[in-house]
Amino acid sequence: MAKVIIFSGAGISAESGISTFRDSGGLWEEYDIQDICSAGCLDWNYEQTVEFYDKRRFDIKDKLPNKAHKQISKLKEKYPDDIAVISQNVDDLFEKAGCNDVLHLHGFLTQIRCMKCNYTEDIGYSKLKDKWDSCPKCKNKLRPDIVFFGEQAPKYEKLYNEISNCKMLIVIGTSGNVINLDMFLPSYNQKRKGKGIQYSILNNLEKSDAINDKMYSKVLYKKATDAIEEIVQDIEKFLN
């Protein structure tokens, strides 16, 4: 198990120009989110859902990792067994920065999956049907390898296992509305006092009603690219 968990959300990728459904304008405004991001939408709205994710895939093609992605990648390379990088994001900016073994909790945009046999393949930034009309193994429908709202997220189990056993938690660029990690902090959970997480850092642009920042050892309300050097220094100090 890793000693340090770096957990990131949409905020870390926003500085690279990747918008989220909470942002106004852009691709998300062209669609009703419930029609293309909710459980079951592939059953009754398959073509439009595939079209939307084809556009999202193309949209990230030219997006580049920022300073935060790059610094985290270097740190992961230096301490491969001591650091785990876990992301709520479905983009490939960590991978573009050279970061290996990223746990993408909500799927991976450049990857497709068979709806029956779970065959997966990375198709890069291609349109799904430009690559395959159907699963090459069982000939059933393919889908974006993304966790839709209301679907089970199988990688959550690994997330909770990793965080339950880590010693340092870094949270970057997340509102806490989807996944709130406060419960893992000793200051929140009396049963965890004296064990588990010893030091924690929260880095967001601003306060979130879903996160109790008083639970964290250090809070940095600034851009991830502005905070990352201090975060890296704290991690290095902790590991050494």
Regions found by a protein language model. Give the residues of each.
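Conserved catalytic core of sirtuin-type NAD+-dependent deacylases
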Residues: 1-240
